[in-house]
Amino acid sequence: MALRVGLGLGQLEALFVLLLIGLLQSRIGADGTEASCGAVIQPRITGGGSAKPGQWPWQVSITYNGVHVCGGSLVSNQWVVSAAHCFPREHSKEEYEVKLGAHQLDSFSNDIVVHTVAQIISHSSYREEGSQGDIALIRLSSPVTFSRYIRPICLPAANASFPNGLHCTVTGWGHVAPSVSLQTPRPLQQLEVPLISRETCSCLYNINAVPEEPHTIQQDMLCAGYVKGGKDACQGDSGGPLSCPIDGLWYLAGIVSWGDACGAPNRPGVYTLTSTYASWIHHHVAELQPRVVPQTQESQPDGHLCNHHPVFNLAAAQKLSRPILFLPLSLTLGLFSLWLEH
């Protein structure tokens, strides 16, 4: 009689756990200093609402004098990417701190790490809300140790292209409606939004627009959201990530930048297109290596989303000398989802 040796159900479960631990150790160095970007342990949950702990481990909270003002994205063990408008020139870096590993901003957790800021590099072309160059690099005072709750997101290379219609996720701790703060304990919020082409976004922003105050969608901007409105970013999340999934990894496709009201119809959220600044990022931080983004799907034509005529004249708008005006976004954009479904 042949002797058959097999594993019981409990042994198989134990083996699976060991394999999972081994996989995580291969992605997180023994000293916690290395981790592959854009990988998460939590399964993806579509839609909107509160995220789960560790679901977006690159999301950080940027505080000014102890108050949350903006979001940001961890891209290495010592660098964070955020929006330039989060750091007015008159503010000192000593007044900022970066909170990593947080889920509920108002709750204490051993997973949370707070670092002071050693350096802030804002893009030189940034001038005001809605202008080009709304991106900043923040160097932490010391390297952070990666964990299940603290991990970097992938930076896209300069030639990266994210297709129209791709469903990405914007995250943050901002307002849930205009002038309505997220309630204690302020859990991290997530909202899935489809990407919209620059041409269609410009067309939408021309609907009911004030001619003297054009909303110009620049070449370094990316739009995402819903034509009917109701779900968007709002005050409190500027600088946070627009994370897009490509071939099993998450990429920092956009940085929450500006918008015209929160969740208004025909006004999708506008983000800084991170890939535009891949060379600028590498110039200032040589160790940051943007990744080539695989082209896994074609862009979906979205011209039908805007039937407004005439089509917004982008070239003419760029020639106007009058400043572009938006809502007062001094500490800008946070997740917004009106209760339209109720």
From Swiss-Prot:
Glycosylation site residues: N159
Classification via Pfam families: Trypsin (PF00089)
Membrane topology per record: Single-pass membrane protein
Transmembrane segments: 320-340
Location(s), subcellular: Cell membrane
One example GO MF annotation: serine-type endopeptidase activity
Primary localization: membrane
Ranges of residues in domain Peptidase S1: 45-286
GO terms of biological process kind: hair follicle development; positive regulation of sodium ion transmembrane transport; positive regulation of sodium ion transport; proteolysis; response to mineralocorticoid; response to peptide hormone; response to xenobiotic stimulus; transepithelial transport
Propeptide span(s): 30-32, 323-342
Disulfides per UniProt: C37-C154, C70-C86, C168-C244, C201-C223, C234-C262
Signal peptide: 1-29
Similarity section: Belongs to the peptidase S1 family.
Subunit structure as annotated in this protein's UniProt entry: Heterodimer of two chains, light and heavy, held by a disulfide bond.
Function, as annotated: Possesses a trypsin-like cleavage specificity with a preference for poly-basic substrates. Stimulates epithelial sodium channel (ENaC) activity through activating cleavage of the gamma subunits (SCNN1G).
PANTHER family registered for this protein in UniProt: PROSTASIN, TRANSMEMBRANE PROTEASE SERINE
Name assigned to this protein: Prostasin
Organism: Rattus norvegicus (Rat)
